[in-house]
């Protein structure tokens, strides 16, 4: 059931400005697309699936802890999120962050830990997280159609084609187990399935060791 419409306030506008400032010098991997395009896409998907204002703000800011300029530091970003937007927005953003940026483990360990933790996350985190993954997976599919297997070089060397597709399949399975946001998860599942078909590779998670 869709939530009652809540008009977006000046807080959302402030979050949009903050996202634009914090990610101003960043582009999407392997492209010249400004990173803000991804953040707007995630917020749009979340709103389409019933996000309230806190969830929409968290969608805009979901990458700030991991990807804000290093000179600011994760602690500064967390304090800024808490002071400007409140504890709930901070908690959603933290729930969407897949690693402690002060001691970032390997790609495999980060992704295994993230997927394992999803069933314990509240509905708001799952909404923003799945919106992020749907936007990312849709970009992977679009880019694969344009440049073929070269797209996998944009990802962590430890991931490659097998790891990337396997990770998305593992995400879908984890989201499905929560029984939250079923329409959103069906959309993600459909995109991941299409990647598997077109790339000729069924995703397997966890990855073989």
Label the model's feature ranges.
Residues 1-209:
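Active-site helical microenvironments for divalent-metal-assisted chemistry
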């Amino acid at each position: 059931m869709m939530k009652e419409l809540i008009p977006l306030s000046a807080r959302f506008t402030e979050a949009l400005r903050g996202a634009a400032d914090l990610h101003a010098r960043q582009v999407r991997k392997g492209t010249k697309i400004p990173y803000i395009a991804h953040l707007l896409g995630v917020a749009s998907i979340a709103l389409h699936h019933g996000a309230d204002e806190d969830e929409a703000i968290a969608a805009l800011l979901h990458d700030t802890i991991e990807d804000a300029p290093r000179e600011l530091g994760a602690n500064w970003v967390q304090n800024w999120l808490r002071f400007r937007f409140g504890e709930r927005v901070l908690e959603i953003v933290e729930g969407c962050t897949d690693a402690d940026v002060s001691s970032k483990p390997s790609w495999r360990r980060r992704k295994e830990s993230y997927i394992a933790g999803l069933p314990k996350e509240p509905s708001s985190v799952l909404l923003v997280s799945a919106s992020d993954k749907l936007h990312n997976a849709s970009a992977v599919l679009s880019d694969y159609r344009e440049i073929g297997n070269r797209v996998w070089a944009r990802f962590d060397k430890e991931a490659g084609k097998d790891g990337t597709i396997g990770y998305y399949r593992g995400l879908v399975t984890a989201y499905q187990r929560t029984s939250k946001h079923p329409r959103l998860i069906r959309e993600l599942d459909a995109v991941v399935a299409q990647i598997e078909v077109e790339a000729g590779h069924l995703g397997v998670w966890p990855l073989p060791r």
